[in-house]
Amino acid sequence: MTITTDTTLLHDPRRQAALLYWQGFSVPQIAAMLQMKRPTVQSWKQRDGWDSVAPISRVEMSLEARLTQLIIKPQKTGGDFKEIDLLGRQIERLARVNRYSQTGNEADLNPNVANRNKGGRRKPKKNFFSDEAIEKLEQIFFEQSFDYQLHWYRAGLEHRIRDILKSRQIGATFYFSREALLRALKTGHNQIFLSASKTQAYVFREYIIAFARLVDVDLTGDPIVLGNNGAKLIFLGTNSNTAQSHNGDLYVDEIFWIPNFQVLRKVASGMASQSHLRSTYFSTPSTLAHDAYPFWSGELFNRGRASAAERVEIDVSHNALAGGLLCADGQWRQIVTIEDALKGGCTLFDIEQLKRENSADDFKNLFMCEFVDDKASVFPFEELQRCMVDTLEEWEDYAPFAANPFGSRPVWIGYDPSHRGDSAGCVVLAPPVVAGGKFRILERHQWKGMDFATQAESIRKLTEKYNVEYIGIDATGLGVGVFQLVRSFYPAARDIRYTPEMKTAMVLKAKDVIRRGCLEYDVSATDITSSFMAIRKTMTSSGRSATYEASRSEEASHADLAWATMHALLNEPLTAGISTPLTSTILEFY
């Protein structure tokens, strides 16, 4: 067998002519190159249909011819082998194109497409932050924090225990949520958030989730477990039984509103007892009688220390603590008033307007971090704290986010209308199932800037949400307008006319219910607590009889929530909770 060594052109002139034609040569040029007659080449073109051959088929025949020439070449160079490999890959690619033209399946063109949906694919880590995301979070954190918040950050780097007394609404919970997420990502330490109630603890969770979304990370789970290092973000109410088993950095908010704080502190402090962990306590002030005040003042540290050398004296005045101070008991303390926050870059307040909206005493308590002496209050904090419960954990029959949160069980509504621009208060009260049982405040609302019709409409919506059995409304003065509108859709509504005698009856009823521990509301509802604490016993203008009044402030709003609660409680007789000895009944037949 004779093997050709001519690799330039095939010996079949008819095939050579076709390949040259597809390269762009004309019929006369091809005839001259092959030394053939022009009519012969023209005849081949017409008979073989060179023009009708698809472009991909032309390339395939050209590849085949060239590859065949290289394969039968006896002595191949390195360049020949490279070209053979290249041509082989091109033939494979053309084969995929042909399959795609028949099936329309993109996977025939690109094999990687078929691998995209394979089960063996590695799943992305849950709650995972890339290095770039963490860097961006840090940048956002420092750019969006006020100066006084960055002071808290620096203190946290140096001190194990931070104790902060603060004004309302200066962004402490917001800030510490962000700080804790970054600390968990960097250190791997668990972050524990302990609040007055589980509902309040979830405020931390909402802020953390929103912070993570700024870098396109969706955090899920309760607790949230970070995919980077396994650190947990744990959100707890004040149930010490659930708190004691955890370990990590601790954040406790609103400590001056937590009932039985000393019991909780003993358990909670153990969660951050290791030297590399830290504890942060922060709160607005409540009353000097609160359990947390000795912890703040240093009195708790001195208990059991008889020696004068062991005892400490801590100046907890604003002058001493405005800039933050490491005190002798090892705690770093700071007081941040609303004026301090303004100096620290928080320009969200109009202080002069707040002073106009609040009495001098109320402004000092709400915004200047001064404690209230509740000795003159009809309802001292010591009594009210027995009413505070973690409703999310203890009220299993109440679903706050359902269309009908309390099902078909009856509720009572108490309403204190808006007077002269202050807010209107409304409570939804669940009466006890049995005589002498507990009342529960399911909902409370404070509405400001509403006219009579809007106030009445707000009550009407509550009647659609609950099985309302009773509505009590203060119909004194301007309140009569709301009462008349409510009676149009709820004819059984009761109008309550304020007199010294009526106020006394309401206060005595509420006092009895609270004294017996028969009122419950969520521990995070500090506005209810403040509202009751604002009520004082005074004399009427004539000086002939005693009555009950409250300071008028934007926050306590003349104790509207307390009065609204008492309007609802009035549906039960004053003697209903008084236990009476069992008596026998005699039935006579005549």
Curated annotation (Swiss-Prot):
UniProt keyword list: ATP-binding, Nucleotide-binding, Viral genome packaging, Viral release from host cell
Record-linked Pfam families: Terminase_5 (PF06056), Terminase_6C (PF17289), Terminase_6N (PF03237)
GO molecular function term, any single one: ATP binding
InterPro entries recorded: ATPase_terminase-su_N (IPR010332), P-loop_NTPase (IPR027417), Terminase_6C (IPR035421)
Residues covered by region (Disordered): 105-125
Signal peptide: none
Recorded superkingdom: Viruses
Homology family: To phage HP1 protein ORF16.
General function of this protein: P protein is probably the ATPase subunit of the terminase which directs cos cleavage. The Q, P and M proteins are needed to package DNA into proheads and for the conversion of proheads to capsids.
Protein name: Terminase, ATPase subunit
Source organism (scientific name): Escherichia phage P2 (Bacteriophage P2)
